[in-house]
Amino acid sequence: MTNLPEARELMVERQIAGRSIGDPNVLAAMRRVPREEFVPAHLREFAYDDTPLPIAEQQTISQPYIVARMIEAAQLRPGDRVLEIGTGSGYAAAIAAAIAAHVDTVERHAALAQSARETLARLGIDNVTVHTGDGTHGLPEGAPYDAIFASAGGPHVPRAWREQLALGGRLIMPVGHERYHQRLVKVVRRTEHDYDERTLGAVMFVPLIGDDGWPAEDVMLDPPAVADSPTQHARAPDDL
């Protein structure tokens, strides 16, 4: 039987710190949050493998390394208010919540949203609010946000997300014109109308579905075989 606490520590040492993640807050969060609580029971022994894992609704829990990369790139700080698009199991929200003051997270699948609420409550994580809806609209009632990150890839950065960033806010999102192949981009809001954008690396995420993302009817019902492989949330370059 896998020793899960020991496996978690090895994951942080080898997959996270060992691959150039240096933010001490991110490393502490990855050590603190039990990933096994966010995966299906029959996959718990694989919780700390360097791979995404399938959950429900043809979605996945992201590869630990890419979660750490995205959150490090978002430069989260204590006191930050964060918006996540694509709750999934709730794992990335839990990691962000271990650093930031509060996390709003939006999930379009009601069953996934409810499961994430229950998991977060069971773990005593009380600074995450899970919302159900079209994440491409963001969450206007909670804006502005110090950081926004998306766990799904779209054809472009939704306008609402840019508008809901605070001045100095950071946005991390997979963007690409192919549904399962994207580049991870970082957007920083400099002034009311000026944004900096740069590419951090190549990634593969499930599609962002919504009014300002991919139309649901155009997305394949069954993701490609790679979707549940270690490259589903690709191993981004170490210079991210």
Regions found by a protein language model. Name each.
Residues I61, V82, E107, P230-T231:
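Intrinsically disordered, low-complexity regions enriched for glutamine and histidine
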Residues Q75-Y195:
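Conserved nucleotide-cofactor-binding alpha/beta core module
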